Amino acid sequence: MNNMHSQTTIAAIATPPGRGGVGVIRLSGPKAYDIAQKLTQKNLPEARMAGFRKFYDADGSIMDEGIVLCFPNPHSFTGEDVVELQGHGGPVIQNALLGRLFELGAIAAKAGEFSMRAFENGKMDLVQAEAIADLIDATSQAAARSAVRSLQGAFSTKINTVLEKLIYLRLHVEAAIDFPEEEIDFLADGKILALLEDVQQSVHAVQTSARQGQLLREGLQVVIAGKPNAGKSSLLNALAGVERAIVTDIAGTTRDVLHEKISLNGLPITLTDTAGLRETGDIVEKEGIRRAIKEIEQADLLLLVYDLNQGDDPLKLAQEYFSEHIEPRRLMLIGNKCDLTGQSAEISDYQGFRHITVSAKQEMGVQGLVDAITAHAGFHPEEDTFIARTRHLDAMKRTQLYLAEAREQLVVFNAGELVAESLRLAQNALGEITGDFSADDLLGKIFGSFCIGK
């Protein structure tokens, strides 16, 4: 698509805030070259050729010096004239240069506006634009590789292939409607049903891959909870591979919620260690317990850690602590300190719940726990896994619902017009993923989550 509203020239700092050897400011828009030339008081270098320039203030004094790179439209990131100014990376000088660009006619870029313009000018689709942010925010190598695949168009290609099938199906249905004398033959000969079922299977295949991509992007929220001194902090340290939490023999040592971002078998995990759940008069510890309950309610997976030496029934503990939150999909029972009881580290079933015996301090059974966590999440990415977001899965879910409606209208009622309407809605839902069909408020929400300089 070609964007006609970008008559303004935007500017923003493109490097992370703070001190650094190099700081980059990006300009994009019809006046980018004119503004950069006024800043440098010299002709700009040739396209894609680095040129050393001084940067001047309004009174002619030198503010900084550095490299200037020019990218003429339409062969630039945004599809507009783009200039990158590479100066020194201190926040004071970077903000001063940015202020000078505003004086010369640029305006401040909104969050994600550079990527928004690239999308609107047809330089990338919506999935690829999102992949830029996902690559920057990747918390594991596997997530980064998947984001690169999405950026290169792997996800978009799959969606576009399904869209082509869906459009082809719509053409056949529309033909049946346009030529009513042939309607019975078109709708009843089985060809349209076969095409419809093929589209459903194709969407399902993409959904399966997208769920893996969503796990890579969003990871899993895992909470370690249990009685004080059950070994929760030791287990966090064993999983994280670093001594992060305070580990002592004093009950109630962990008084706050500790977070650790790690990768288990390639799956990004936010591991949370909570305060021990118990009655206490200590004000600080009460606050820790309040936060622990909140984390437990929001967790994707809960590891209930208990001391095998105490003879506790883990399921009774879970029922006491978590009440309505306990279910096999969200809870694993972890019997800790098996080295002190002489038990072997193993995985078993305990009344329908996964039960794992470990020794966190001795790291016995820890790898088995890691494997159980990733298997529990259904995480098994392939080499061609692409990054995906919740909105992508939601769009595919709605697509499948509309396709199911279309199938019912075809098989049960033989109602061609209703089939056509359901297929139209399915195409619109699927088209939201790449941006072929997207409301303005959806675009604003997506790009508004980006960095300012992206």
Curated annotation (Swiss-Prot):
GO molecular function, one term: metal ion binding
Binding-site list for (6S)-5-formyl-5,6,7,8-tetrahydrofolate: R26, E84, K123, K454
Taxonomy, superkingdom: Bacteria
Cofactor: K(+)
Limits of the TrmE-type G domain: 219-378
Subcellular location: Cytoplasm
A Pfam match: MMR_HSR1
Amino acids binding K(+): N229, T248, I250, T253
Gene Ontology CC annotations of this record: cytosol
Binding residue positions for Mg(2+): S233, T254
SUPFAM superfamilies membership: P-loop containing nucleoside triphosphate hydrolases, TrmE connector domain
Gene3D superfamilies: P-loop containing nucleotide triphosphate hydrolases, Probable tRNA modification gtpase trme, domain 1, tRNA modification GTPase MnmE domain 2
GO biological process, one term: tRNA methylation
Family matches, as CDD domains: trmE, TrmE_N
Keywords: Cytoplasm, GTP-binding, Hydrolase, Magnesium, Metal-binding, Nucleotide-binding, Potassium, tRNA processing
Residues engaged in binding GTP: 229-234, 248-254, 273-276
Main location: cytoplasm
EC number: 3.6.-.-
Cofactor note: Binds 1 potassium ion per subunit.
Subunit structure and binding partners: Homodimer. Heterotetramer of two MnmE and two MnmG subunits.
Homology family: Belongs to the TRAFAC class TrmE-Era-EngA-EngB-Septin-like GTPase superfamily. TrmE GTPase family.
Function according to Swiss-Prot or TrEMBL: Exhibits a very high intrinsic GTPase hydrolysis rate. Involved in the addition of a carboxymethylaminomethyl (cmnm) group at the wobble position (U34) of certain tRNAs, forming tRNA-cmnm(5)s(2)U34.
Protein name: tRNA modification GTPase MnmE
Species of provenance: Acinetobacter baumannii (strain ATCC 17978 / DSM 105126 / CIP 53.77 / LMG 1025 / NCDC KC755 / 5377)
